[in-house]
């Protein structure tokens, strides 16, 4: 049986099922997992969603780490990425709502959490590592 199309309500229910508690209005809910604040932001009108976790203030990040983040986005992440917005480094997963599956939503959540937790160490969204040429542990 085919999975029904994703909706904002269904997406938020699946998100809620993964955590102990959520707060915030529909379209902008948040939770805390392992001391990491994770947000599910959705815009059904434009068929877009994103899962975000605040990682660091960019002003407090060694400028050399920005290059490490870009390399990690290529070699050590799957579908989630490091991103910078308004002076903040985030881990982020973006997807159209209508084609999002339950498994992709859960995987995106897990990857965002892993990137946030692995910032400063492996910079990886999971155990996958294609290896950064010329990069040692940072």
Q: Where does each model-flagged region fall?
A:
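A short, solvent-exposed beta-edge/loop patch
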Residues: 81-117
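Short, surface-exposed beta-strand-loop junctions and turns on beta-sheet-rich folds
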Residues: 46-48, 57-58, 97-99
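Charge-rich, low-complexity N-terminal segments
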Residues: 1-37, 77, 81, 138
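Short amphipathic alpha-helical signal-transduction/dimerization elements
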Residues: 74, 113-120, 124
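Short, well-structured hydrophobic secondary-structure segments
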Residues: 40-52
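Short, internal acidic amphipathic alpha-helical interface segments
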Residues: 50-88, 92
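Short, highly charged C-terminal tails/helix-capping segments
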Residues: 124-138
């Amino acid at each position: 049986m085919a999975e029904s199309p994703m909706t904002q309500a269904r997406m938020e229910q699946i998100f809620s099922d993964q955590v102990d508690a959520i707060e915030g209005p529909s379209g902008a809910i948040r939770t805390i997992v392992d001391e990491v604040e994770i947000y599910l932001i959705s815009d059904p009108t434009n068929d877009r969603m994103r899962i975000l976790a605040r990682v660091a203030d960019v002003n407090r990040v060694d400028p050399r780490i920005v290059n490490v983040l870009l390399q990690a986005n290529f070699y050590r992440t799957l579908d989630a990425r490091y991103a910078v917005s308004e002076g903040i480094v985030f881990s982020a997963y973006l997807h159209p709502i209508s084609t999002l599956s339950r498994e992709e939503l859960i995987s995106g959540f897990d990857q965002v959490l892993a990137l946030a937790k692995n910032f400063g160490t492996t910079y990886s969204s999971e155990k996958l590592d294609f290896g950064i040429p010329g990069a040692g542990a940072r």
